[in-house]
Structure formats: structure tokens, C-alpha cells
Regions:
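Acidic, histidine-bearing metal-coordination/catalytic regions of metal-dependent phosphoesterases
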Residues: 1-52, 59-60
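Contiguous hydrophobic segments
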Residues: 10-33, 113-116, 128-133, 188-221
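Short alpha-helical segments and helix-capping/turn motifs at coil-helix boundaries
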Residues: 34-35, 64-69, 204-206
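Flexible, charged surface loops at secondary-structure boundaries
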Residues: 43-45, 74-77, 129-130, 182-184, ...
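Active-site neighborhood of phospho(di)ester-bond hydrolases with catalytic His/Asp-centered motifs
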Residues: 51-53, 80-86, 134-140, 189-192, ...
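Acidic, His/Gly-enriched loop-helix segments that form or flank divalent-metal centers
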Residues: 147-222
Length: 222
């Protein structure tokens, strides 16, 4: 067990220099949970806002859901009705599938997208009945497809976008451009916030960090 070198002056004991195996200790790490109590409001008459996000209307869809959305709006009876973008999908103007491809040839005409939006709005108003909240429409990236198409085809500038906007404006909707904030009592509504370069803030982690870090007010976005 021991290997010793003896002399009149010193002794070395081998057992002191045996390899010592490290002990591995695994302990469970529990991330602390910080709970912030919700603030209670002292308002006796709070402002009620009903938000419609990303409806993505297309001609081939069953649009009956908009009647029931309207019924829910009527029941809630909001002060404001806000659409935060992508009400219409506008696959007609999509650049993902080129027109000469098989998928591209299945894209609907622009007027079919506009007519489907008209039908969806009529069902929505039917469900809403006689209530008349203040209405606003924040354009989304799918509506932007239409404006980009017109921008690239000078001969039709305004021909389709004005028809589309009129569907909303004639019923009292205000319209804000893509990326612009619409404020209600200090709360901002937008389809997606844009960064300093004018690009969309996207991705799960980016949305969790950049939007919350850069915001100076509450934001509702789709």
C-alpha cells in the first residue's frame, strides 16, 4: 500500500500522491420567478377597444366568421374598433409565386381580393347592428403588397388602392400607413413596429427584447 524511500533525513510516502478523482455534484438550478402585481385602475369609465388582427381575407374563404365577429363586437360595445393590419391577404399581388409558375397562375385577380374584403365587411356590419364605435385601420404588410404592385406599375397607380380604401373610408374608418402608430389614450396600435432603418422588428427574441426595450409607451401589434 505504501512505497517509501527512506534515509536518515526524509521519507516519501507514495500514498500521499495517489490520483484523486474529483467528485461531481449535480444540483438543480431553479430560475427565480419575479411576479409583478397587476396595476389596478381607478378609472370609473375605462375606454373599451376591440381589436381585429390579421383576418387574411381571401376570395376562396367562407367569410361567415365575420358575422360572428360583428356579433361579438356588438356584445362588447367598444368605444373604438381597431384593425391592426392584414385584413385582406392580397395574394393577387404576392411576389413569392411568379405569375408564370403553376402556383402563380392560381393567384386571384386583384378585384377578387377587393370584392372579398367588401363581402367580409358587409357581414361584419350586419353582426354589429346599430352600434357605431370610432373605427381605425392600421395597414399591414399584406396590404402593402397592393401599394407595391401599383408602385411598380405606373399605369394603375391608385386604381386599386383607392377602391380598397373607399370600402373602409365610406363607413368612417380612419387609415394609417404601414408602420405608423395610431394612439388611443397613450396606447399605440400598429401592425408591426419598425426599427430605425424602416425594417420590421421580427423574430421571437427580437420581439421580446427590442420592442420592450425601445418602447416608451404600451404597444398593441399583430
Amino acid at each position: 500500500e505504501k512505497l517509501a524511500l527512506s534515509s536518515s533525513h526524509w521519507t516519501i510516502e507514495w500514498h500521499r500522491y495517489k490520483e484523486v478523482k474529483p467528485q461531481i455534484i449535480i444540483e438543480e438550478y431553479k430560475k427565480p420567478i419575479i411576479r409583478i402585481p397587476a396595476q389596478s385602475t381607478t378609472f370609473t369609465n375605462p375606454t373599451k377597444v376591440f381589436v381585429i388582427p390579421d383576418a387574411h381575407v381571401s376570395p376562396e374563404q367562407d367569410l361567415e366568421r365575420f358575422y360572428w365577429i360583428g356579433k361579438q363586437i356588438k356584445e362588447y360595445n367598444p368605444d373604438y374598433l381597431v384593425c391592426i393590419g392584414d385584413f385582406c391577404s392580397f395574394d393577387s399581388c404576392s411576389t413569392f409565386d411568379k405569375n408564370h409558375t403553376v402556383k402563380g397562375q392560381k393567384k386571384p385577380p386583384i378585384l377578387a381580393d377587393i370584392n372579398a374584403t367588401r363581402d367580409a365587411l358587409e357581414l361584419l356590419y350586419e353582426g354589429m347592428g346599430d352600434i357605431n364605435p370610432q373605427k381605425h385601420y392600421c395597414l399591414g404588410n399584406h396590404e402593402l403588397r397592393l401599394y407595391k404592385y401599383e408602385d411598380e406599375h405606373k399605369e394603375v397607380v391608385g386604381a386599386f388602392s383607392q377602391q380598397y380604401e373607399t370600402l373602409f373610408r365610406k363607413k368612417g374608418w380612419g387609415i394609417s400607413e404601414y408602420g405608423d402608430f395610431y394612439f388611443i389614450k397613450g396606447v399605440a396600435f400598429v401592425h408591426v413596429p419598425l426599427n430605425e432603418m424602416g425594417r420590421e422588428i421580427g423574430g421571437k427574441m427580437a420581439e421580446a427584447s427590442q420592442v420592450s426595450n425601445a418602447a416608451t409607451h404600451d404597444i398593441v401589434y399583430g
